[in-house]
Design a protein with these regions (language model features):
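Conserved catalytic-core motifs of GNAT/GCN5-like acyltransferases
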Residues: 79-81, 149-152, 164-183
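Conserved GNAT acetyl-CoA-binding A-motif
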Residues: 112-113, 125, 141-153
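Conserved GNAT-fold acetyl-CoA-binding loop/helix
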Residues: 26-49, 60, 94-95
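Conserved acetyl-CoA-binding loop-helix of GNAT-fold acetyltransferases
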Residues: 126-139, 161-165
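A short helix-loop-beta-strand connector motif used in the catalytic cores of GNAT acetyltransferases and
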Residues: 50-63, 80-84, 114
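Conserved beta-strand in the GNAT
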Residues: 63, 69-78, 114, 119
């Protein structure tokens, strides 16, 4: 039986791994830069999950548990907090990799609970876990009286179909990291 719970800092390593799966390898390597590896990037992400002032914080994360094993996660936060929460990532990448990511595009804004990262372990896909994580996150959005918003890769129609089936609707085209995306929202 899969349970959805608030994340704990002790789950940071697996949450970081799952977030990196959601980002994809090329994106992670871009953020780490040419002189560093995705293992280096994982160390940074783990440290960001362990913090409370990061967009990737465990405090912003729901996990799917199969027994005690984390098999999925969904990271979300109030879009109004993006710039403040992103500072930990910017400072961390600068310190760890000498990379300046302070000019990143904004993927969200005030007025929505932004679903930053959603991932399910390969061994547990196809069991409705992503749907359960999204439904729990949408309940969080409802409690905050905000629509839930996300960006979906224009090259991932299967993900967009899942979001549409769950009530997410197209808002506008977007770009993130020079990548064409679609901004979707689910109203409260």
């Amino acid at each position: 039986m899969i349970r959805i719970e608030n994340a704990l800092p002790t789950q940071a390593a697996i949450i970081a791994t799952l977030i990196m799966e959601a980002m994809n390898h090329e994106c992670c390597q871009y953020f780490a830069g040419p002189r560093h590896t995705t293992a280096d990037f994982h160390r940074l992400m783990k440290s960001l999950v362990e913090r409370t002032d990061s967009q990737y914080s465990y405090t912003n994360t729901l996990v799917a548990l199969d027994g005690t094993e984390v098999v999925g996660c969904c990271v979300s936060y109030d879009g109004a907090r993006l710039h403040r929460l992103r500072q930990a990532f910017i400072a961390g990448a600068q310190a760890a990799f000498g990379m300046d990511h302070s000019d990143m595009d904004d993927e969200t804004r005030a007025g929505e609970l932004y679903i930053d990262s959603l991932a399910v372990a390969a061994s547990h896909r196809g069991q409705g876990i992503a749907t359960s994580l999204l439904e729990a996150t949408c309940r969080k959005a409802r409690r905050m009286n905000l629509p839930a918003g996300l960006l979906v890769d224009q090259g991932n129609p299967a993900a967009e179909r899942l979001y549409s089936r769950l009530g997410f609707e197209y808002v506008n085209d977007a770009e993130w990291g020079s990548h064409p995306m679609r901004h979707l929202q689910r109203k409260v």
